[in-house]
């Protein structure tokens, strides 16, 4: 093993594999076993430096006064990424090609062509994730250890490498969502059809009530003198009963509220009959959206366009379900913020 590797793990940590070698005058010794280190992208390079130093033997006192070997991290600075002042101000707000803006690419080790540029030493206080993002413009970066015969070349992970496990998990979760979405859609349609039938039955009941009142009023001996208080009491009783029903269910007095209650009750029965778990459904949606946010964050770091539809299984039902879940969460957050602002104003 002559080169190092920087790999991703299912736990979202980075696994750095280095072929550490020290000065050895014995020619019959086998290759040194590579060293694996787990680091977090938000940790600084100085933390990684200390991990490497802990695995190295102390330097020769005759060659160095320091008790530890220095470790330097260098990434390639492309020639066309030299920072220059703008030649002409852009009055329209558009970006110019000669401005002090550096270009980034998420190709990493998958990049084509030959890297051109010089390696630049990075400060130990830099976060590992920022260092990798900049180093991804080339195929590899260098790790130089004091006293080693040469630098260690480490292959830079691309965007696909960094998000491999996240995208695999997103695909598995999307398949689960797709199966549940088919069941949920069937149950929801059946519940809405049932609610519509109940509404039509109510309309038929009102028409029947009107017809009975008409017959008893104009075609019998009862007349309007008897039917007037009867219709008044029936209407008032219906109004009071409906109002009490809305109070009992703690809902706004409206047709939509009554329809939602009817649909929800029917949905719950159908969900139980079909073995659909609403908690699992919401959990899968939250998990998929969380992974989607992480992947988009990495895509933003690498400045690449991520085709999320492909990793979501290409199912329009899954995409719509995730989009609706994000809208609901955003609406809930906005309402909570408005409530907090109102409390502060009071």
Swiss-Prot record:
Belongs to the MCU (TC 1.A.77) family. InterPro entries: MCU_C, MCU_fam. The selectivity filter, in which calcium ions are arranged in single file, is composed of two acidic rings separated by one helical turn along the central axis of the channel pore. The chain crosses the membrane at residues 196-216, 227-248. It is found in: Mitochondrion inner membrane. The gene is MCU. Residues 76-91, 109-119, 315-328 have a biased composition (Basic and acidic residues). GO terms for cellular component: mitochondrial inner membrane; uniplex complex. This is Calcium uniporter protein, mitochondrial. Ca(2+) binds at residue 228.
